[in-house]
């Protein structure tokens, strides 16, 4: 609601052909491009898909994280296709807690798929993200919550 994603971007694409994790997933990741803007209050308590009932299906938005409770409102991803390994009990994280999903793309999935198909990536130090960080982030012009 604060408009903080305006001028943010999508900077990471993960597909089975470039995924360095197991099991392979397909997502685009984005949010704030300047992560120095992240604050401690941006951390979001972890809610599993078992608690919310929002499974990682095509177009679902979810918080990126390392450990539970380290997800930030400043960094999120969008599922491209169904990604059950990201749900509670899924095998993508050793802790089995999955990722905290919180919304869904209501229009524009064709754009999400085009972003996910971008092949031009840059070198990074983190081997987990090798071949996934875009040379040029795709800018978010606007993002907002749609009321029912």
Place the predicted regions along the sequence by residue:
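Cyclophilin-like peptidyl-prolyl cis-trans isomerases
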Residues: 1-148
């Amino acid at each position: 609601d604060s408009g903080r994603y305006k001028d943010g971007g999508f900077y990471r694409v993960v597909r089975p052909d470039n995924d360095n994790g197991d099991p392979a997933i397909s997502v685009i990741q984005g949010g704030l491009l300047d992560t120095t803007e992240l604050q401690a209050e941006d951390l979001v308590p972890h809610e599993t898909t078992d608690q919310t009932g929002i499974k990682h299906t095509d177009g679902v938005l979810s918080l990126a994280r390392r450990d539970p409770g380290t997800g930030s409102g400043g960094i999120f991803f969008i599922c491209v296709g169904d990604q059950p390994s990201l749900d509670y009990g899924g095998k993508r994280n050793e802790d089995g807690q999955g990722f905290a999903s919180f919304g869904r793309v209501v229009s524009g999935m064709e754009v999400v798929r085009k972003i996910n198909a971008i092949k031009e990536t840059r070198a990074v130090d983190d081997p987990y993200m090798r071949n996934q960080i875009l040379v040029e982030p795709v800018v978010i012009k606007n993002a907002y919550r749609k009321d029912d």
